[in-house]
């Protein structure tokens, strides 16, 4: 969605989770969504057709919340991403992962990925971006890799942070918390005067959705949020106790518009939200990428209203 907001037209999307595919189709029926394992997807028919190849490589192999097996983890899809880069030969590549990917224990692996992109003909930019610097009311640090093909003038720069524009959790969610007339909403807004910890959507192995392990839950509790579960609805008028977030509240903290529809099952919806790359961050990075593509085209054609083609 963030890349769409930046001016890209999606040529194709590949997604493994069936419920996630259905959500994408429900919101954007015109998108070509392929619900399949990327390991069996053939990118060669799209060679030369793609301006931007973008993807979020699964984070568990690099997350500090896991065993950090990196390339030894069967869920590591960096090799598949590099295969698609070679097959499709996009003008620009964008890869997103968790902060753990930048850990010292992955220095050699990270260097090998950059070297592979260099060999495939790309200049590489790597930076850690915090979602809270781009209007998203949660910390959510993410490692971003940008590869610009060497036949394109590389004027890419990462977007400048503007944390002063980011709301607190209380201000961001006040209307949703007060939707059912909760009398404690104003007092709660004053308590929730910080930026949220990184949102998670719960583990497939450990039951329903929640807001993460004990440390994260404690941080939520300081803002008047019970992180042990997710509510179906906002607090009632006479509710007493510690409020819980709803899936819609989680989505807003992640930067989704309020009209974006998720899976019907709460657990699935929360996992989809928690696994997402915040659209406002993707938009800002996408705008910087589009500037490079537009500049590369300026000598050959007008760039006005040219839809850039993204593949993800």
Could you say what each language-model-derived stretch is?
Residues 25, 38-40:
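Class I S-adenosyl-L-methionine-dependent methyltransferase catalytic core
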